[in-house]
Structure formats: C-alpha cells, structure tokens
C-alpha cells in the first residue's frame, strides 16, 4: 500500500529507476533487456505524468528531474551490455538523494544477493523494489526482507502487478 501511495503522492515522491542491461541476467538475452527498458520507460512516464520527480539510470545513460522526452531519449539511447548494477544504483542514489522509491529492473538470472546489495545503495527509508523480467515466472508480487519483488513476463503484466499485488 505504501508503494502505491508513494507513486500517487506527487508532493513527496521521487522514483529512481535503475535498469540492468546485462543480457546474461535475463532469460531471453538482449530481447529481454529491451523489455526491461520498456518497463522502465512505462514506469518513468507514469511517474512524470503524475508530476513526480523521476530519475533513470540505464547503463551509460541517465536522466534526472527532466522532461518526458529527455527521459525517453536517455532510455532509447542506452546500450545493451554488461553493467555493474551496484555502481548504477550508487549513481541513481547520488542523482536522487531524496528518492522515495528505488527500483531495479533486472532478470531472473541476477542473484538476489546482488539485487539486495544494489538496492542497499539507497537510503534506509527508501522503498526498495526489484522488477524481475522472466518469461517463465509466475506473475505477481512478494516481499523478501525489505524488498518488494515484482515478477512479470511481459509489459502487459506490469499494470497488473502494480495494482493487484501492491494493493492487496
């Protein structure tokens, strides 16, 4: 419930999104990375349209507190390839020290301990979310420690996990 409230309250929300562009992190390689970037773009656009501060870090590209077109441009220009998600999360945290939600988009092959360490780059009070892209997973939401884990197979699943799982 708090995650949704953070998404919907523009007076205090700042969504910070990090995208893992390492093809080996995903079932489906580069196509799955493109899906991850599409999910990040969808979340970023919703956040910006709701007049919330938004930061994205995707491999060699970043955008913070800017317009929708510039944010989409950064996402579109990002290269697919190995990335240090720990360093990327650190960059996102530095760009958005006031973030209320830190979100890492990754694949099912990224070890959970690495997800935890990456999201730990955000302040303690930041809501930590991992969006895992996996064509073989059960779509849904679960909680692992202080991390909310959203699992989707395709872009169409994103709205369902945000509204059905987080509100439940």
Residue ranges and their predicted role:
Residues 1-168:
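Exposed, interaction-prone extracellular/peripheral surfaces
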């Amino acid at each position: 419930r708090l995650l949704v409230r953070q998404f919907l309250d523009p007076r205090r929300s700042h969504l910070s999104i990090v995208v893992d562009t390492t093809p080996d992190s995903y079932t489906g390689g580069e196509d799955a990375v493109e899906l991850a970037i599409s999910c990040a773009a969808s979340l970023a656009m919703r956040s910006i349209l709701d007049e919330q501060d938004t930061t994205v870090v995707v491999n060699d590209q970043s955008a913070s507190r800017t317009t929708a077109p510039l944010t989409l441009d950064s996402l579109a220009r990002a290269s697919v390839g190995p990335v240090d998600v720990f360093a990327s999360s650190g960059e996102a945290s530095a760009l958005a020290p006031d973030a209320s939600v830190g979100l890492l988009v990754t694949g099912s092959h990224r070890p959970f301990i690495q997800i935890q360490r990456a999201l730990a780059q955000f302040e303690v009070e930041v809501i930590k979310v991992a969006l895992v892209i996996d064509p073989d997973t059960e779509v849904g939401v679960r909680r692992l420690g202080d991390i909310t884990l959203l699992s989707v197979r395709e872009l169409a699943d994103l709205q369902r996990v945000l509204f059905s799982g987080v509100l439940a």
